[in-house]
Design a protein with these regions (language model features):
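Membrane-proximal intracellular helices of multi-pass ion channels
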Residues: 1-343
Length: 343
């Protein structure tokens, strides 16, 4: 609404962006101009991503020598991350270089989240003003979504992840000797820069192939809570922002209440199912005292895995800390229901 906030210290950065991009922040747009700007920025970044993914074998920050993606795989990757789907037909350790992880995947995760927030800001302004003749400036909404929300939160979450063991380096793979005497190759890289926006932007595309089930992407119980919180915070906040902006906070409270009730009920049901274990597996003589642990990480456990499964599907995030197809049938049903409701 143009009111002063404590995040106004980012204004010089925003003015710099407007200046170098030739943007007039005072120019109002109608819905056609707004839509044209949204489609234009996404089209530009699509071709940017295609070029870098296909050519990544010749680009810097590739200590492991990962080759470029085939054109069809690059097309799939770009479309997937451009529409905030984050379907991955590759494994990040071998399918991408550090350069493309940062300047394609991480960039797209910021851009798509910011585009969604900018689009919602335009809708909210139109509803508040009861007109589509002027719905704000898309470029201003896009820029402020990044500088005032996504970047500060990502920085804070990233620092906490680094403290807890998530790597932030540009070194290549390390070969280690295990306790059994065998060798294991450990991939690393700038994971702590990418995981925060993966969660905060409800993106979901993992840095590593196994996503947040990987111990370097989600090292312990604290990071599991942090990443789960990161999934929820902005979708929840946007409901209240909607009510604030159109001056109907009671409506926002009702919407939030319905969403929270459905989410809480789903979490309770799924946790009950997963911690109860599988009767079929128990009949095979395998203890189910820890719950149904098939496809789950010991450091996370069945209850936290169940809660994550519900959290990631109610928000269309898609990240995982366990294998959802290994959860009990009724938990899987709840996750499918969440995805269908989101559609």
């Amino acid at each position: 609404k143009g009111e002063r906030t404590w995040l106004d210290f980012m204004a010089p950065v925003e003015r710099f962006v407007y200046r170098i991009c030739g943007i007039d922040p005072m120019q109002e747009m109608n819905w056609k101009q707004f839509l044209k700007a949204l489609l234009t920025v996404n089209l530009f970044w699509f071709f940017w991503g295609m070029l870098l993914l296909v050519c990544q074998g010749w680009l810097p920050l590739n200590p492991d020598g990962n080759p470029g993606q085939s054109p069809d795989l690059a097309f799939n990757t770009c479309i997937s991350f451009m529409v905030n789907c984050n379907l991955q037909h590759y494994s990040g350790e071998s399918g991408l270089s550090y350069f493309t992880q940062l300047f394609v995947i991480m960039l797209f995760q910021f851009v798509t989240a910011a585009c969604g927030m900018a689009a919602m800001a335009g809708v909210m302004k139109a509803l508040a003003a009861k007109t589509t003749k002027t719905i704000g400036n898309f470029w201003v909404f896009l820029t402020k979504s990044v500088t005032r929300i996504l970047m500060p939160l990502s920085l804070a979450v990233g620092i906490l992840l680094i403290i807890n063991g998530t790597p932030m380096s540009f070194d290549g793979r390390q070969t280690l000797t295990t306790l059994e005497g065998g060798e294991q190759v450990i991939s690393q890289g700038p994971a702590a820069a990418i995981v925060p926006i993966k969660q905060l932007g409800t993106n979901g595309g993992g840095y590593f192939g196994t996503n947040s089930a990987h111990p370097l992407e989600n090292p312990n119980a604290f990071t599991n809570i942090l990443e789960c919180w990161s999934i929820l915070i902005l979708p929840m906040a946007m409901v209240w922002a909607f009510g604030f902006y159109i001056r109907r906070r009671r409506l926002a409270a009702w919407i939030f209440g319905v969403m929270l009730f459905a989410y809480t009920a789903g979490v309770i049901f799924s946790v009950w199912q997963e911690t109860g274990g599988s009767r079929q597996i128990e009949q095979m003589g395998i203890s189910q005292k820890l719950g149904s642990m098939e496809g789950k990480e010991i450091r996370i456990g069945s209850a936290a895995s169940a809660m994550w499964g519900m959290t990631t599907t109610v928000t269309s995030n898609g990240s995982v800390n366990s294998m959802h197809d290994s959860q009990t049938p009724l938990s899987g049903m709840m996750q499918m229901l969440n995805m269908q409701i989101n559609c």
